[in-house]
Amino acid sequence: MSTVAPPADQAADVLKKLSLDSKSRTLEIPEPTKKTGVYQYGAMDSNGQVPSFDRSLSPMLPSDALDPSVFYVPNVYQQPYYYGYGSDYTGYTNSESVDMTSGAYGENASLVYPQGYGYAAFPYSPATSPAPQLGGDGQLYGAQQYQYPFPLTASSGPFASSVPASTQSKLSTNKAANSASAGIPKGMNGSAPVKPLNQSALYGNSALGGGLAAGYQDPRYSYDGFYTPVSWHDGSNFSDVQRSVSGSGVASSYSKANNNVPATRNQNSSSNSHYTSMYQPASMTGYAAQGYYDRVSPNKSYGQYGSTVRSGMGYGSSGYGSRTNERGWLNTDNKYRSRGRGNSYFYGNENIDGLNELNRGPRAKGTKATEEVSSEEVKKQTFDESNTEETVTCVLPDREECNRDDFPVEYKDAKFFIIKSYSEDDVHKSIKYNVWASTPNGNKKLDAAYQEAQQKSSGCPVFLFFSVNASGQFIGLAEMKGPVDFNKNIEYWQQDKWTGSFPLKWHILKDVPNSLLKHITLEYNENKPVTNSRDTQEVKLEQGLKVVKIFKEHNSKTCILDDFSFYEARQKTILEKKAKQQQSQKQVWEGKTNDEKPGTVDSTM
């Protein structure tokens, strides 16, 4: 058994075997670089803490991800602009006079990336982005103060706005109608301050029903009381202001001014949840000055889940409000009208009063006028034309007399033209008064054709195929019976811009769908179908005879005569409306004339 060395000797042994280097080495450990986390609305520190949501901050996007021709939205969802939705980008400015016309950012004018799910529209390009905003006048607008939309998911507690109203506007309230809604006790007259419409401060007990909470501005009406052109909902339409929508989508978190019990949010899942992000503080300076959320991308641009695909694709009442037609402008004159698509409540391009152009009458929905109008009931009417009174004879044609079986369909020589009317109201008046008027160029074209036809000894009638824009059908065949009188203006057209007139006679009155005529192409119109023609488009003899034959042989169950009483009532209402407008304009003009008389002193000086 070997002896064990003492511990002191063992320690000395170990020390001898150790080899020491001449240079000391330090352990090199790379220090971790602090990486800034990317957050949707700004920067996030290394601890994962998200900074407070501040409106003064700008979004942080990586520099290599920016393209001068691309507009990057906060939620990174990019939507194309070329789907035909450019009509929602209208020429308006916000309260800071920043142009909001163009839907294109940067150099590429064919693309724009509007917001995707649930975000309001932006009037500015991102503050840190080099992409300039291209205005409608061709000017480039630099980065402005960035404005964030309200978050989609609202807080559980009551929302208190930190944005003060820009102006303390006051509206005089009606003691009978407005005193109660403004929180003023009955019997008191005066004015009440208008509160801004904040997020989720919508309506009473449901999303769109029961009226607004007291003291808040109704977003469906502009500051002057007119119905707003912007449709704020994409679901079922409502035909009355006080009518509620079934199934509350977003309840108000505000307590009414005359109620101490605050309303609670609806915790149930609803497809209308994206409404919360579209309502933001609004002042009473008018819709043209309410900022970025109304005119650029109104809520009607978004579908049920916030995408840019409209429900109904623009047709039917699901895409537009039942009181408006697409933009739904309330026009005070007849010269400039919106030519939008119709909805299920009206029959065509109607406005709030329902008196704009109709491309089809009630018969298009399978209903006919309940009252039949006879020729005796159509009385003579007198119109003031160039300070001379002229009596116009109105004769209602008989249906069988117009659609005669012996009407010839073969002609050795004849001229044919397509007439595109803006409304059936004008066609109704043409049938009633046996007269028509086209555009200045159209009148010249038709008059030249008629003068040329009259010089032919063998006879050459000039036929007109009538169709209303966007109606999908032709409605009749008429013949010119005289030259165009360029100095004779008729006042009973739907619009006041038509000048000149010429007499005609109606031969066929029936609804002929375009599907029966699409196979006929026109050499004068790049071989396009006859159904794709402009006003006063000339048709060659061969194609014209084919159209006449189809008109005669088609067995139609409806024609414009079915809606004659309907258009008679509309004409009366339109004339009354025009008379009131003229009277109002006359009063305004007389007031201006009195103010401009010598000797009057301006009170503002």
Swiss-Prot record:
Signal peptide as annotated in the record: none
Biased composition (Basic and acidic residues): 368-383
UniProt feature coiled coil, ranges: none
Gene Ontology molecular function: RNA binding
Tree of life domain: Eukaryota
RNA-binding is among the record's keywords: yes
Entry-linked Gene3D superfamilies: ph1033 like domains
Chain intervals with Polar residues compositional bias: 256-274
Positions contributing to RNA binding: K420, S421, Y422, D426, W436, A437, N469, W493, W498, W506
Keywords on record: Cytoplasm, RNA-binding
Classification via InterPro entries: YTH_domain, YTH_prot
Stretch list, region Disordered: 249-274, 357-384, 580-605
UniProt name for this protein: YTH domain-containing protein ECT4
Organism: Arabidopsis thaliana (Mouse-ear cress)
